[in-house]
Design a protein with these regions (language model features):
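Second-shell loop/turn segments in exported
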Residues: 46-55, 96, 137-143
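Metalloprotease/metallohydrolase-associated module, dominated by Zn2+-dependent proteases
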Residues: 67, 132-215
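Soluble non-cytosolic domains of exported or imported proteins
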Residues: 52-59, 103-104, 108, 142-146
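N-terminal low-structure segments adjacent to metalloprotease catalytic domains
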Residues: 1-40, 44, 213-214
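Active-site recognition of the HExxH zinc-binding catalytic motif
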Residues: 107-123
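Short pre-active-site segment immediately N-terminal to the catalytic Zn-binding motif
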Residues: 93-109
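Auxiliary, metal-adjacent structural segments of Zn-dependent hydrolase domains
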Residues: 33-91, 158-163
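Short acidic alpha-helical/loop segments enriched in Asp/Glu that coordinate divalent cations
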Residues: 76-81, 120-132, 165-170
């Protein structure tokens, strides 16, 4: 177990030209309407817009996530790679170019940052079996994608309600998933609502403390 400690990581945004060249071009040819991708300047502008949207509240969000989880990020930088035709994922951290409003970006990026914090931190080994842990906490009858989103959604709700005082973000998050008919994500929210987000986050924090005491 690595005992490395560090401060809040810097979140940096960049248009990933290489990812776009190696993957987005092909995806555009496969799924697009024949319109070519936009220019380098267009996509760097989107990355800059995302950074501008994130900056006013970003450090507050990241610091709060460390506080409410009891975890510290292993890495001191989170590079957010922006490229067309991609949905969001956390490792590496990638965002598409579809966000039109600040709140949509905040919700999605915060979601992915929680994924990163829960699985790449200074408390647990990077190869720790989190699926086994979460099955023991939340049950074995969930779809994989539901299981991994139960802790994410619980901490999102704690952040939205108890830290940011933004219940509107909670509602926007749920409505966006409903509009996409994202059944496994919706099932995770339903579990959180039924169980209670504080029950879930308290259970995770307890395990974090136990994990530290065992080192």
């Amino acid at each position: 177990m690595n005992g490395k400690s560090q401060s809040i990581p810097e979140v940096r945004f960049e248009y990933s030209f290489l990812l776009s060249d190696q993957a987005s071009e092909g995806l555009n040819n496969l799924w697009g309407d024949g319109t070519p991708l936009h220019s380098f300047e267009y996509y760097t502008g989107i990355a800059a817009k995302y950074e501008k949207w994130w900056q006013p509240d970003g450090d507050t969000i990241v610091a709060a996530l460390c506080q409410i989880t009891g975890l510290q990020f292993y890495q001191n930088t989170i590079d957010v790679h922006v490229a067309p035709w991609f949905n969001a994922f956390s490792s590496p951290m990638v965002l598409g170019v579809m966000f039109k409003k600040k709140d949509d970006l905040i919700i999605t990026l915060t979601h992915e940052i929680i994924h990163r914090l829960l699985t790449d931190n200074t408390t647990y080994d990077r190869h720790y079996d989190f699926l086994k842990l979460w099955k023991s906490m939340f049950g074995e009858d969930h779809a994989w994608n539901t299981l991994v989103h139960i802790p994410v959604h619980a901490f999102l709700q704690e952040l939205y309600i108890d830290v940011l005082d933004r219940p509107d973000l909670l509602e926007l998050d749920k409505k966006s998933l409903e509009s996409l008919d994202a059944k496994e994500y919706i099932a995770a929210w339903e579990y959180v609502e039924k169980t209670g987000y504080k029950t879930i986050t308290d259970k995770i924090r307890k395990h974090v403390k136990e994990q530290r005491s065992d080192r």
